[in-house]
């Protein structure tokens, strides 16, 4: 049965979420300063609305997962299916297989999904729908969506309220306006796109092409990345599970290092452009002696360098544990001409293995400066073990809230948005805003200061 006001609390359109809640009161204007463009930005609060605009029995929804694996993918899929089915009575739900290419593939037919089929998916790692990198052919994807868009809207012209980009003196409330007359004459499909920053950029292109063609299709993104590098929202799903699983690798590295003479345990964690997993895993473990992230450059030799620090730590404790994010130190690793140009299927530069490089460099250093002395480096790369696990309890709950927020938004008439928490409150954020934003570790804030306090590592600033 479709959601109704008598069934649950609903959100009013006047309820908004501020993007920024921390202000510099020492400035002349304080919280009312116009110097920061984020100060007056707010987003509509996520949640069910009084009115829905689609006849559930005629509504078709498509769900797709793109990019790399991440804990919680199956939970999001499950909750989208269950939410659409149980909260709104939608009975036509399709799972697009193998990522974006599944929209137009002649060999990977969509799966028909229902609550019984997805009942235990939240206990599984990976994605049952399968995923892939690349395969983004904008026109083939939108052609496929347009061909299958045959849902009828519910409501009359004067019942339907669409939200445009509207700015008052205090808040900017970004959302998306559709053409009412075109909408009432056409069919409607809902597309739920689950993926990371690259996938969100693809979703923006899909949404823009759909708008250009004037076909009314609801497009919503659900941000996914274990790296936690998606901007604006508080965090992406799978991140907390990744931090939890990283503890096992760090603990193993600590045991190996502690059990050897002059032993170093080296752990490489995920994080191409950001070091959030390495940072949080370091703070959670308290076994780490040094944490290296992409946002903080480091150097090996010389005063205040990594080698000097590890040498002193081995003299003091007899062992050390080093955590490095995969994107750290990439500018220090020698590359061939071919490696400089190598890209993966998503168009990203292929990173070299910083862990293997560090292991080699540390062995060279020890052989040079401590010939004949015992030394060992145990290198652990848990990347695929972490990516493949099911979501933990916290991420499972988070995935449920993300999925249900997305459903409520599409059913209320929003399109071209991402659902996610801002300052602890769930909001509807324009896809383009999220696709353009990043979430780097701020090495000048308190979290990085905590890392420096816990590890006593150098700041790697050359004098």
Where do the language-model regions lie?
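Short glycine/serine/threonine-rich phosphate/pyrophosphate-binding segments
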Residues: 70-80, 103-104, 136-141, 156-164, ...
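Accessory alpha-helical/coil subdomains and C-terminal extensions
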Residues: 144, 155-156, 193-195, 201-205, ...
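Gly-rich Lys/Arg/Thr-decorated short loops/hinges at beta-loop-alpha junctions or inter-strand turns
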Residues: 56-64, 99-102, 120-129, 145, ...
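Short, ordered loop/turn segments at secondary-structure junctions
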Residues: 66-68, 95-101, 133-134, 158-159, ...
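Glycine-rich oxoanion-binding loops at beta->alpha junctions
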Residues: 13, 19-55, 101-160, 171-189, ...
């Amino acid at each position: 049965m479709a959601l109704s006001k008598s069934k649950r609390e609903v959100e009013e359109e006047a309820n908004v979420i501020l993007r920024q809640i921390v202000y510099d009161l020492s400035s002349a204007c304080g919280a009312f300063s116009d110097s920061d463009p984020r100060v007056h930005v707010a987003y509509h609060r996520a949640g069910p609305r009084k009115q829905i605009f689609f006849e559930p029995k005629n509504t078709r929804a498509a769900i797709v997962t793109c990019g790399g694996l991440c804990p919680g993918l199956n939970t999001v899929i499950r909750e989208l299916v269950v939410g659409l089915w149980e909260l709104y009575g939608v009975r036509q739900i399709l799972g697009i297989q193998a990522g974006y290419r599944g929209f137009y593939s002649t060999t990977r037919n969509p799966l028909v999904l229902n609550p019984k089929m997805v009942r235990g998916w939240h206990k599984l790692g990976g994605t049952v729908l399968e995923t892939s990198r690349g395969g983004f052919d904008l026109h083939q994807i939108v052609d496929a969506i347009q061909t299958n868009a045959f849902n009828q809207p519910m409501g009359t012209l004067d019942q339907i309220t669409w939200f445009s980009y509207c700015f008052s003196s205090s808040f900017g409330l970004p959302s998306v306006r559709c053409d009412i007359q075109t909408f009432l004459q056409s069919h409607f499909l809902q597309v739920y796109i689950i993926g990371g920053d690259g996938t969100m950029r693809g979703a923006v292109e899909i949404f823009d092409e759909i708008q250009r063609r004037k076909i009314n299709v609801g497009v919503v993104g659900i941000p996914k990345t274990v790296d936690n590098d998606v901007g604006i929202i508080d965090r992406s799903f799978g991140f907390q599970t990744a931090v939890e699983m990283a503890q096992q690798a760090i603990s193993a590295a600590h045991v190996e290092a502690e059990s050897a003479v002059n032993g170093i345990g080296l752990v490489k964690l995920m994080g191409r452009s950001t070091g959030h997993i390495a940072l949080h895993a370091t703070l959670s473990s308290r076994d780490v002696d040094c944490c290296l992230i992409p946002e903080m450059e480091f150097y090996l030799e010389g005063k205040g360098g990594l080698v000097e620090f590890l040498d002193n730590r081995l003299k003091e404790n007899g062992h050390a544990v080093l955590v490095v994010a995969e994107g750290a130190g990439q500018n220090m690793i020698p590359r061939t001409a071919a490696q400089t140009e190598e890209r993966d299927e998503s168009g990203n530069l292929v990173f070299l293995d910083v862990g293997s490089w560090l292991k080699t460099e540390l062995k060279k250093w020890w052989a040079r400066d401590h010939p004949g002395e015992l030394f060992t480096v145990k290198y652990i790369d848990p990347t695929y073990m972490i990516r493949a696990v099911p979501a933990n309890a916290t991420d499972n709950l988070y995935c449920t809230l993300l999925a249900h927020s997305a459903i409520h938004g599409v059913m209320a008439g929003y399109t071209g948005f991402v659902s996610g928490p801002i300052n602890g409150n769930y909001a509807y954020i324009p896809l383009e805003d999220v696709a353009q934003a990043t979430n780097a570790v701020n090495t000048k804030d308190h979290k990085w200061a905590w890392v420096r306090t816990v590890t006593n590592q150098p700041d790697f600033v050359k004098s």
